[in-house]
């Protein structure tokens, strides 16, 4: 019988299950017979038998090098099965076999292809994670140190706080009102001076230089043992903003309003950015928000009211005045009856009950049955900016009576019933719930026609109107009549949010009321003066 020459590569077959091998025993036996008939196989078997009799360990060359008697290209096994084709064949497990001999002599003589590959890959892939930040390249490091040298030149004892501001803006490139925070991070001994060497240790050797600005801001603000920001971490930068910003200079004579302004800014930051609601603002949340951009805008813009995100004084003024109007006894707390008067009794009792049940958010107020100023800030932002995701989440929790994550027909009807009753009492044309239900589903277009989930609301531009229909009568009627004033305002400032437009309207109203009050007080004083009889 003429021998058949086989391509060795054909022996490198995919792993086959035992069941399939049993069903093709004739083919396997034929293949094995053909392999045994090869001249190379005859030499291999003879060599292995002789080595086994002599007690010589089997050494196979695997992709690198191996040591031993039969290693190298002259080995019959290596010539038939080159290392590049895969791992060596495993010999039969029998007494005196090469496998037993290898166990006796140790594993050091057999190279591992996996180890070779791992070492090679380790050499090719550079380190990409640095726990304390990526070290700066030498050229960047040298450029930064040269700038530092120029700013510290002639100040052997170091820079004082006022002199350090230039370092904050030109070296650190963060907003100028971060100067005090950075200064205290470097001046750990409270000497009142920052030395050149100490600043290099903090900024360059501490790898702050290579961090992007959001990570820099996060690191500057947070406490050393924290990996998150708490509200108090923002107070130093806001105090410096109040002390240095030209648009807030007029508040320097009223420290109590400076404190209220700073608190309001912090509450607004946490409302929009701290989506977990746990009071711990993470780096990931900070990166997803727009706070750093707003900080840079506030640093560059002299008119603080143009910084609509977080820092506008006019926005603070509106929030504080709305709270003060409701807080009739001025104990800085609001109860349920106070809140029901919000926006000329626009809200239903049922939705106010849900708010005071602390369903959408736990009150920070320690007085039972009353909300504090922070709680009110969250409420008014949710009420007047219903297109934002935090607002949608706030009101969704209120309407979701059984907290199962979906709004059903019964839940929607429960809240609309009070709206319907109010319309009837005011002799207005009532809209039946069946018609409202169709309108709500047309606006939201939920994936499931049987209920509305939070993602459905987040995917619709009309979601805010859904909640207005359910529990805010004033906004519901304005939506039904398509208030032309609101339409003009939207067209005039298309980039503004609902909150921006509301705050603008309210600030104008409050300013006009204050002007009228001032004029009234002035005329009364003049009238009193005219009645005085000189002596």
Curated annotation (Swiss-Prot):
Residues 67-104 are annotated as: Disordered. Probable regulatory subunit of type 2A protein phosphatase. InterPro entries: EF-hand-dom_pair, EF-hand_13, EF_Hand_1_Ca_BS, EF_hand_dom. Pfam families: EF-hand_13, EF-hand_7. Residues 174-209, 387-422 form the EF-hand domain. Signal peptide: none annotated. Keywords: Calcium, Metal-binding, Repeat. Ca(2+) binds at residues 400, 402, 404, 411. It comes from Arabidopsis thaliana. PANTHER family: PHOSPHATASE 2A REGULATORY SUBUNIT-RELATED, SERINE_THREONINE PROTEIN PHOSPHATASE 2A REGULATORY SUBUNIT B''DELTA-RELATED. GO terms for molecular function: calcium ion binding. This is Probable serine/threonine protein phosphatase 2A regulatory subunit B''delta. PP2A consists of a common heterodimeric core enzyme, composed of a 36 kDa catalytic subunit (subunit C) and a 65 kDa constant regulatory subunit (PR65 or subunit A), that associates with a variety of regulatory subunits. Proteins that associate with the core dimer include three families of regulatory subunits B (the R2/B/PR55/B55, R3/B''/PR72/PR130/PR59 and R5/B'/B56 families) and cell signaling molecules.
């Amino acid at each position: 019988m003429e021998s058949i020459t086989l391509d060795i590569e054909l022996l490198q077959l995919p792993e086959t299950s035992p069941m399939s091998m049993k069903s093709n025993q004739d083919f396997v036996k034929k293949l094995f017979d053909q392999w045994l008939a090869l001249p190379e196989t005859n030499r291999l078997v003879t060599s292995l038998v002789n080595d086994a009799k002599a007690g010589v360990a089997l050494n196979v060359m695997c992709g690198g090098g191996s040591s031993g008697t039969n290693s190298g290209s002259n080995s019959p096994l290596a010539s038939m099965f080159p290392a590049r084709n895969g791992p060596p064949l495993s010999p039969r497990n029998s007494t005196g076999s090469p496998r037993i001999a290898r166990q006796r002599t140790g594993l050091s003589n057999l190279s591992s292809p996996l180890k070779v590959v791992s070492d090679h890959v380790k050499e090719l892939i550079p380190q990409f994670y640095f726990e304390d930040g990526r070290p700066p390249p030498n050229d960047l490091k040298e450029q930064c140190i040269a700038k530092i040298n120029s700013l510290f030149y002639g100040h052997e004892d170091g820079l004082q706080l006022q002199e350090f501001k230039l370092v904050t803006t030109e070296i650190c490139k963060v907003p100028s009102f971060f100067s005090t925070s950075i200064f205290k991070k470097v001046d750990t001994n409270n000497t009142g001076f920052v030395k050149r060497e100490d600043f290099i240790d903090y900024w360059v050797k501490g790898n702050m230089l290579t961090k992007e600005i959001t990570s820099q801001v996060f690191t500057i603000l947070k406490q050393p043992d924290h990996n998150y920001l708490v509200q108090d971490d923002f107070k130093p930068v806001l105090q410096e903003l109040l002390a240095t910003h030209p648009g807030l200079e007029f508040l320097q004579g009223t420290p109590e309003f400076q404190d209220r302004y700073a608190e309001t800014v912090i509450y607004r930051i946490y409302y929009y950015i701290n989506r977990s609601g746990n009071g711990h603002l993470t780096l990931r949340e900070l990166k997803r928000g727009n706070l750093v951009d707003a900080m840079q805008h506030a640093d560059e813009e002299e008119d603080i009211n143009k910084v609509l995100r977080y820092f506008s004084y006019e926005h603070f003024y509106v929030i504080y005045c709305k709270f003060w109007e409701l807080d009739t006894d001025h104990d800085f707390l609001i109860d349920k009856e106070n809140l029901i008067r919000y926006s000329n009794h626009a809200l239903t009792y049922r939705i106010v009950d849900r708010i005071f049940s602390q369903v959408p958010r736990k009150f920070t107020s320690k007085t039972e049955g009353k909300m504090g100023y922070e709680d009110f800030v969250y409420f008014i932002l949710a009420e007047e900016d219903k297109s934002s995701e935090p607002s949608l989440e706030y009101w969704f929790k209120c309407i979701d009576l059984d907290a199962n994550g979906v709004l059903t027909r019964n839940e929607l009807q429960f809240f609309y019933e009070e709206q319907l009753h109010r319309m009837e009492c005011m002799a207005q044309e009532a809209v039946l719930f069946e018609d409202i239900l169709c309108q709500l589903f047309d606006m939201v277009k939920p994936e499931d026609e049987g209920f509305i989930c939070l993602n459905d609301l987040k995917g619709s531009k009309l979601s805010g109107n859904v909640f207005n229909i359910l529990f805010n009568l004033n906004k519901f009627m304005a939506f039904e009549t398509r208030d032309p004033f609101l339409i003009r305002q939207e067209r005039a400032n298309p980039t503004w949010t609902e909150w921006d437009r509301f705050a603008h309207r309210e600030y104008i109203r409050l300013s006009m009321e204050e002007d009228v009050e001032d004029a009234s007080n002035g005329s009364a004083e003049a009238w009193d003066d005219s009645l005085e009889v000189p002596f």
